[in-house]
């Protein structure tokens, strides 16, 4: 294996480990725990990322790239509902809930802000298109969707089974999670019976926790 290939493999392992440790330990995830889970030395981590914050910032950039790609794929679907549903399902799998603990604890870089803005614009376009087509309930906003996705991306059952090493139950838990997601999606349809309580959440409610 060439040095370049080994470096790429180590980086992939570090990013995967960082996501996993972050999901369990939150923003207090230690560099040592991340390196150990990745099976590399701490020196390898610091050769790639000068600080833990830089590693977490890179994770956020990668996730924002994934959200933008999912939204653009949704917009490419001519069916307003299916396009929106594709974005929601894909965003849930990306797992924004695991990055939420970083809010307010790391500096938002210009790259993060730019990618977030582009992603927000694409998702807003999905929501507006679905509203115009009459397939998305009129009282659902882009912020509602962002908060819903963050909640659905968390799976305490899957996390617990993973910690217990219950590989025999993981697939059933994934199927159960897919059912819950489908129930939530149906609740977004314009045919939903009951109005939502309270006022729509502001964009600041969702975004200001990232300010330091």
Specify the residue positions occupied by each region the protein language model found:
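Basic, helix-initiating cap at the start of DNA-binding domains
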Residues: 1-37, 54
């Amino acid at each position: 294996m060439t040095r370049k290939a080994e470096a790429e493999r180590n980086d992939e392992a570090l990013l995967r480990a960082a996501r996993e440790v972050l999901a369990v330990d939150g923003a207090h995830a230690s560099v040592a725990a991340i390196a150990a889970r990745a099976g590399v030395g701490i020196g390898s981590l610091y050769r790639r990322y000068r600080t833990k914050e830089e590693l977490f910032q890179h994770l956020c950039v990668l996730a924002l790239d994934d959200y933008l790609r999912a939204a653009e794929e949704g917009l490419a679907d001519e069916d307003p509902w299916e396009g929106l549903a594709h974005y929601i399902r894909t965003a849930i799998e990306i797992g924004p809930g695991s990055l939420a603990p970083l809010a307010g604890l790391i500096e938002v870089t210009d790259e993060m802000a730019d990618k977030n803005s582009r992603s927000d614009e694409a998702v807003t376009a999905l929501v507006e298109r679905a509203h115009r087509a009459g397939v998305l309930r009129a009282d659902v906003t882009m912020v509602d969707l962002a908060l819903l996705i963050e909640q659905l991306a968390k799976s305490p059952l899957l996390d617990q089974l993973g910690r217990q090493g219950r590989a025999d139950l993981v697939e059933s838990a994934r199927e159960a999670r897919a059912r819950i997601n489908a129930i939530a999606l149906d609740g977004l349809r314009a045919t939903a019976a009951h109005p939502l309580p309270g006022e729509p959440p502001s964009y600041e409610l969702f975004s200001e926790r990232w300010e330091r």
